[in-house]
């Protein structure tokens, strides 16, 4: 890989509905990496997700096709396995794509992970991505897919399925 160049870090002040990167995504880099450190949910049973805007668009509702699977081992040792998450993938959907599910809000609960977005400024091809996350449930979640637009992607937003992001930071790097 190339040199990681930090572009921007967003840190939750404890009351964020979302964390949005609305500048810094351009043709300078062919790959953008988002690093999530100790993202904490306001309420239990939340899903951290993302969506994007194409150039000139709003609403964070671009069309995606995705996959989602996980290896898990419950903290209480009451469940373990490997599973494909049919309720978390999309087939040409416009919802926020789940990156980490079943997040809780206990004081020691958080998730950390990485999202890779490839060639977001390319105007010929769709935009590919993949992510890997871990959380207190001892879940290793893998998500991959593509954003079905040939328009440049200029904005990326992260939010919980309900409630606020209560802590943590997301850093965006160009590679």
Describe each region flagged by the PLM:
Residues 1-175:
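Surface-exposed molecular-recognition determinants
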């Amino acid at each position: 890989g190339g040199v990681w160049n930090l572009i921007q870090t967003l840190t939750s002040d404890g009351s964020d509905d979302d964390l949005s990167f609305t500048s810094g995504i351009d043709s300078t880099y062919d790959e953008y990496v988002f690093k999530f450190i100790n993202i904490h949910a306001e309420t239990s049973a939340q899903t951290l997700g993302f969506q994007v805007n194409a150039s000139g668009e709003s609403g964070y509702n671009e069309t995606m096709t995705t996959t989602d699977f996980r290896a898990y081992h419950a903290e209480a040792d009451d469940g373990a396995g490997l599973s494909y998450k049919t309720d978390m993938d999309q087939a040409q959907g416009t919802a926020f794509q789940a990156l980490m599910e079943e997040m809780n809000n206990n004081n020691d609960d958080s998730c950390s992970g990485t999202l890779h977005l490839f060639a977001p400024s390319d105007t010929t091809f769709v935009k590919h991505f993949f992510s890997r996350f871990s959380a207190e449930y001892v879940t290793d979640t893998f998500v991959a897919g593509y954003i079905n637009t040939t328009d440049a992607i200029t904005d990326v937003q992260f939010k919980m399925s309900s409630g606020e992001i209560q802590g943590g930071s997301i850093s965006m790097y160009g590679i």
